[in-house]
């Protein structure tokens, strides 16, 4: 097992949470981190999830308690050990005020970055891993600016699409609007950043 393994388990696309046979006496509705069943959370670099259950799993060590999460974008399921919540970077959705700040950030002038695509890719990859929307926005702005000057490499194009998806999906949920509408708002802000 690699030394950075965080205990997160990806489950088959159609795996039902009932398949884990969580013992009733160990099933919870709120964890010590305050996340509740039914709450929407962000799993860094993957997107918005919903907590389906909090409890043990027979496929891991007894005594470990997990968040049983369902990805909203594709309905795949994950289990994250509660003890690894900080390491994984699991967080609550941003609030309206933070989303307004995000749009202001998207509209600011783009900061200079590596001219070498490999250095730029490494730098952007580290930002994506944080799970903070501000860092994901910096990646999106950076790659958007580069794409206006030249074609993105295959890896950078995938990263651009991932960054856009992560921002669009969270903004849409927080603002209560359809994703295409959120995407238009983000595109407008990105255009403003290029106009400086």
Where are these regions (language model features)?
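A positional/architectural concept
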Residues: 22-88
């Amino acid at each position: 097992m690699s030394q950075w393994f965080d205990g997160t388990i990806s489950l088959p696309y159609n795996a039902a949470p009932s398949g884990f046979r969580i013992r009733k006496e160990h099933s919870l509705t709120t964890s010590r981190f305050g996340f509740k069943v039914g709450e929407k959370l962000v799993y860094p670099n993957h997107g918005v999830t919903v907590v389906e259950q909090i409890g043990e799993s027979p496929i891991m060590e007894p005594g470990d308690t997990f968040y049983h999460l369902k990805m909203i974008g594709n309905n795949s399921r994950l289990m994250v050990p509660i003890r690894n919540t900080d390491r994984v970077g699991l967080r609550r959705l941003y609030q309206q005020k933070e989303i307004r700040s995000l749009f202001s950030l998207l509209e600011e002038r783009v900061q200079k970055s590596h001219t070498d695509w490999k250095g730029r890719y490494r730098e952007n990859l580290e930002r994506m891993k944080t799970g903070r929307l501000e860092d994901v926005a910096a990646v999106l702005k950076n790659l958007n600016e580069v794409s206006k000057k030249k074609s993105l490499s295959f890896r950078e194009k995938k990263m651009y699409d991932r960054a856009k998806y992560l921002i669009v999906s969270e903004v849409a949920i927080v603002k209560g609007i359809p994703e295409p509408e959120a995407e238009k708002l983000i595109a407008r802000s990105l255009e403003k950043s290029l106009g400086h």
